[in-house]
UniProtKB/Swiss-Prot annotation:
Record's comment describing the protein's domains: The presence of a 'disulfide through disulfide knot' structurally defines this protein as a knottin.
Tissue expression as described in the entry: Expressed by the venom gland.
Name under which the protein is recorded: U3-lycotoxin-Ls1p
Compartments reported by the entry: Secreted
Predominant cellular place of this UniProt entry's protein: secreted
Pfam families: Toxin_35
Organism from which the protein derives: Lycosa singoriensis
Family (UniProt): Belongs to the neurotoxin 19 (CSTX) family. 01 subfamily.
Propeptide residue intervals: 21-44
Single GO MF annotation: toxin activity
């Protein structure tokens, strides 16, 4: 009985040690991957395409507005066969930003009155 108990304790100890090393390896891999993604995002953020500029070279390069990212919208001009792509803000997002701005302004007034 003592042998089985000793063997069980040894087995649990080895299992916990191996799983701890495995989790450390996963954490390190996740951390390295996260850092590389952050670096790529920062590099891409510096090279964003402003609103109403051509985004045909990279359709995911549009800049962010205050709350939302602009969208690369492509269309064919009247009487033309060439596709033109520009970074634009969809109207529903434009209205949502205006509403959020007004709510923020109104919240500031309430805070000023009662603050």
């Amino acid at each position: 009985m003592k042998f089985v108990l000793l063997f069980g304790v040894l087995l649990v100890t080895l299992f916990s040690y191996s799983s701890a090393e495995m989790f450390d390896d996963f954490d390190q891999a996740d951390e390295d991957e996260l850092l590389s993604l952050i670096e790529k995002e920062e590099a891409r953020a510096e090279e964003c395409t402003p609103r109403f500029y051509d985004c045909s070279h990279d359709r995911h390069s549009c800049c962010r507005s205050e709350l939302f990212k602009d969208v690369c919208t492509c269309f064919y001009p009247e009487g033309g066969d060439n596709e033109v792509c520009t970074c634009q803000q969809p109207k529903h997002l434009k209205y949502m930003e205006k509403a959020a701005g007004k709510a923020k302004k109104f919240g500031g007034k309430i805070k000023k009155w009662f603050g």
